[in-house]
Amino acid sequence: MIKAVVINASPRKSGNSSHISEYIMERLEGKAEVTYYVLREMEFTGCIDCGYCQRNRGCVIRDDLHDMYRVFDESDITITITPIYFDGTPWKLKAMIDRMQAIYNSKYVLEDSLIDRSKPRSGFVVCHGGAPEYETQFEGNRNVLQFMYRSINTE
């Protein structure tokens, strides 16, 4: 059975991201072993730039994201559902992504990756916004999420 990570990045309970997440979770039932992150319900901090991950594998912070590195390493697919705020990501998603600095440093500074770089992984992002559509509406979010997905070797 495949392993999936589903991230609901909305700070709003019962909003669009929740409905989309529920739909996706129903479709994955019985087809995937799912780790479901509802970021608004989790207690964690962003990167504090302490430098620990530049000298050691992993992150010194022990909170609800502590197992994130293992979960992403074991995953076959990652699905992120997020609203757009001022062309960007909600703060908790950005804080989670900033904590992936430990993965980046393990790969490129320590050359001892926390993520199996040979394992193929798939990723999907569902973004939605309330503003009238305009050409660059999703670019800020796309840029940040591209870095996140690259850090976990996901296309």
Give names to the regions the model predicted:
Residues 109-152:
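Short, glycine-/small-residue-rich phosphate/pyrophosphate-handling segment
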Residues 155:
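Beta-strand-loop-alpha "switch" segments that mediate conformational coupling across diverse proteins
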Residues 1-105, 110:
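N-terminal beta1-alpha1-beta2 submodule of the flavodoxin-like/Rossmannoid cofactor-binding fold
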